[in-house]
Amino acid sequence: MESCEVPRVKICGITNIEDALHASACGADALGFVFYPGSPRFVDPEQTRRIIAELPPMLTTVGLFVNQSPARIREMVEFCGLNTVQLHGKEEPDQCSYPPCRVIKALRLKDGMDESVFSAYRVSALLLDAYVPDKFGGTGQCCDWTRATEIASRHRVILAGGLNPENVSDAVRQVRPYGVDVSSGVEKRPGQKDPEKVATFIRMARELF
């Protein structure tokens, strides 16, 4: 499913309204909110709800969950006003349905993963991230772009892992993903975005188009 369209851009790890509104104003298509307590970018549901209430109506809001119960995920979706669920844990293919929300399944690329792993997930998109033991994203490590290119030719792929304003244009040129996802690559510190880096990342992600 190789993409020839302008890649969608998701800014993940949003924790405050200032970063959210700036990313939106710069043209981000989606914002990600991390509900994994082990992350330095964790944001509580009340704060997320307040942020989302201030956002433009056509912006995609994504909740990132790691091995949380379906009941808890549904509760958070309704309370916060999320419209997309991103599953970043060990969820099996039959655990990835949360209608009416769209679902993104994150997979950390490692040796031995064959096509059956990717085709088993009937989700809106696959997010490809770097494999780092005991880490669920936000590591700043790049995934294998060559492998990602192969997967993106067959599936709707959001490329993540180690992206930043300096390399995102090359990543888009090689992989041709449906979208790109960044968190640590546009930060001053974990949980606080660098406005200039956010603006540059979004511009460079679309440079080829």
List the model feature ranges, each with a label.
Residues 1-209:
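Conserved N-terminal beta1-alpha1 strand-loop-helix module at the mouth
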